[in-house]
């Protein structure tokens, strides 16, 4: 059965481009379009969508207000479609905290360029959103021959060779590597806001487009006791600090003398993502070994499953979020199937596991 999508955006060009992308994808039906939330609500009286693609800055009623009303009355998967301005990315993070499950960037490179560059990400965002279990979404407090289907799926080999065990140096310093996707913004907020300043350093991959991760990190930093920042190349992984991989870049853990740091690099999509959880986890396996803890959380697909198994095989402790607390039980499920997880636990216990 097709995923029914309602597009809500005040730009006719954006509505047209998004409609074109989704119509070309197998298994997705553009149910209708609306130029503001009032029109959307009228259309939803006759037929309810499976996924709503929502702009955040619109006249008459903004997307955040509409989203909050929707989550209070009939929770429905929402994909935020936002501009790459600072204001746009900040508002998008408010929307994710209010219950949206995915965020995508608005067309900026012209219709032709946008269709070539971003169609895959748009379609994957809608499919991930459609798989979301809305009763697991946490509304956080404020402070077919189609080329989309045939894109080659590269492994972490495209970025980093597999661990051999010979690269791991003895050290007492622990690091935490976390990977997550759909539902992860709320899940990470739930975990990071519980951590004390004395917790081990964290390196985190959350699937998110370029430009949005800085606003996401800034929001978490304002809510947490620990420091949370978008990673820059060469940043040290320190106790009480969480580094979030920039959207559109891969992030790896590297050993540098007596401490760990991150390397932020460009490269191809790995496991169909950039940043890729598999790349982060492989680097943690290779350079931290048993000194690392790997955690795979809510998200669609299998990115991170193989990498977590590599961490496990190199002596790291590994955790998968349980099905009951996941918004989408995809990535953890695949990791569990591979035998990659030492423990399977609910979201509310993960912060304690990090600190024990």
UniProtKB/Swiss-Prot annotation:
<dbReference type="GO" id="GO:0008984">
    <property type="term" value="F:protein-glutamate methylesterase activity"/>
</dbReference>
<dbReference type="Pfam" id="PF01339">
    <property type="entry name" value="CheB_methylest"/>
</dbReference>
<keyword id="KW-0145">Chemotaxis</keyword>
<dbReference type="InterPro" id="IPR011006">
    <property type="entry name" value="CheY-like_superfamily"/>
</dbReference>
<comment type="similarity">
    <text>Belongs to the CheB family.</text>
</comment>
<keyword id="KW-0963">Cytoplasm</keyword>
<dbReference type="InterPro" id="IPR001789">
    <property type="entry name" value="Sig_transdc_resp-reg_receiver"/>
</dbReference>
<dbReference type="GO" id="GO:0050568">
    <property type="term" value="F:protein-glutamine glutaminase activity"/>
</dbReference>
<dbReference type="InterPro" id="IPR035909">
    <property type="entry name" value="CheB_C"/>
</dbReference>
<dbReference type="GO" id="GO:0005737">
    <property type="term" value="C:cytoplasm"/>
</dbReference>
<protein>
    <recommendedName>
        <fullName>Protein-glutamate methylesterase/protein-glutamine glutaminase 2</fullName>
        <ecNumber>3.1.1.61</ecNumber>
        <ecNumber>3.5.1.44</ecNumber>
    </recommendedName>
</protein>
<feature type="active site">
    <location>
        <position position="207"/>
    </location>
</feature>
<dbReference type="InterPro" id="IPR008248">
    <property type="entry name" value="CheB-like"/>
</dbReference>
<comment type="function">
    <text>Involved in chemotaxis. Part of a chemotaxis signal transduction system that modulates chemotaxis in response to various stimuli. Catalyzes the demethylation of specific methylglutamate residues introduced into the chemoreceptors (methyl-accepting chemotaxis proteins or MCP) by CheR. Also mediates the irreversible deamidation of specific glutamine residues to glutamic acid.</text>
</comment>
<dbReference type="GO" id="GO:0006935">
    <property type="term" value="P:chemotaxis"/>
</dbReference>
<dbReference type="InterPro" id="IPR000673">
    <property type="entry name" value="Sig_transdc_resp-reg_Me-estase"/>
</dbReference>
<feature type="domain" description="Response regulatory">
    <location>
        <begin position="4"/>
        <end position="121"/>
    </location>
</feature>
<feature type="modified residue" description="4-aspartylphosphate">
    <location>
        <position position="55"/>
    </location>
</feature>
<feature type="active site">
    <location>
        <position position="181"/>
    </location>
</feature>
<dbReference type="GO" id="GO:0000156">
    <property type="term" value="F:phosphorelay response regulator activity"/>
</dbReference>
<keyword id="KW-0378">Hydrolase</keyword>
<feature type="domain" description="CheB-type methylesterase">
    <location>
        <begin position="169"/>
        <end position="356"/>
    </location>
</feature>
<dbReference type="Pfam" id="PF00072">
    <property type="entry name" value="Response_reg"/>
</dbReference>
<feature type="active site">
    <location>
        <position position="303"/>
    </location>
</feature>
<keyword id="KW-0597">Phosphoprotein</keyword>
């Amino acid at each position: 059965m097709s995923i029914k999508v309602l597009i809500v955006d005040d730009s006719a060009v954006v509505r047209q481009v998004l409609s074109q992308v989704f119509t070309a994808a197998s298994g997705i039906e553009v149910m209708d379009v609306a130029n503001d939330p009032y029109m959307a609500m009228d259309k939803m009286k006759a037929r309810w969508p499976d996924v709503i693609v929502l702009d955040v800055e619109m006249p008459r009623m903004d997307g955040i207000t509409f989203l909050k009303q929707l989550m209070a009355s009939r929770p429905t998967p929402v994909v935020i479609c936002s501009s790459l301005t600072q204001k746009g990315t900040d508002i998008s993070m408010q929307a994710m905290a209010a219950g949206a499950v995915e965020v995508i960037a608005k067309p900026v490179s012209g219709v032709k360029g946008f269709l070539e560059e971003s169609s895959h990400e748009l379609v994957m965002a809608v499919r991930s959103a459609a798989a979301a279990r809305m009763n697991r979404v946490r509304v956080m407090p404020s402070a077919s021959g189609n080329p989309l289907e045939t894109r080659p799926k590269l492994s972490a080999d495209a970025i980093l060779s597999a661990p051999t065990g010979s690269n791991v140096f003895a050290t007492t310093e622990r690091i935490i590597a976390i990977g997550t996707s759909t539902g992860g913004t709320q899940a990470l907020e739930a975990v990071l806001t519980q951590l004390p300043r004395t917790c081990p350093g964290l390196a985190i991959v959350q699937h998110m487009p370029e430009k949005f991760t800085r606003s996401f990190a800034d929001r978490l930093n304002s809510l947490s006791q620990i420091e949370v920042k978008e990673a820059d190349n060469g940043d040290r992984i320190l106790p009480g600090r969480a580094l979030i991989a920039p959207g559109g870049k891969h992030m790896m853990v590297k050993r540098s003398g007596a401490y760990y740091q991150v390397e932020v690099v460009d490269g191809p999509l790995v496991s169909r993502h950039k940043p890729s959880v598999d790349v982060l986890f492989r680097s943690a396996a290779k350079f931290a070994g048993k000194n690392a803890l790997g955690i795979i959380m809510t998200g669609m697909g299998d990115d991170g499953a193989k990498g977590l198994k590599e961490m496990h095989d190199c002596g790291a402790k590994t955790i998968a979020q349980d099905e009951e607390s996941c918004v989408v039980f995809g990535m953890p499920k695949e990791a569990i199937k591979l035998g990659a997880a030492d423990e399977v636990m609910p979201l509310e216990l993960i912060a304690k596991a990090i600190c024990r």
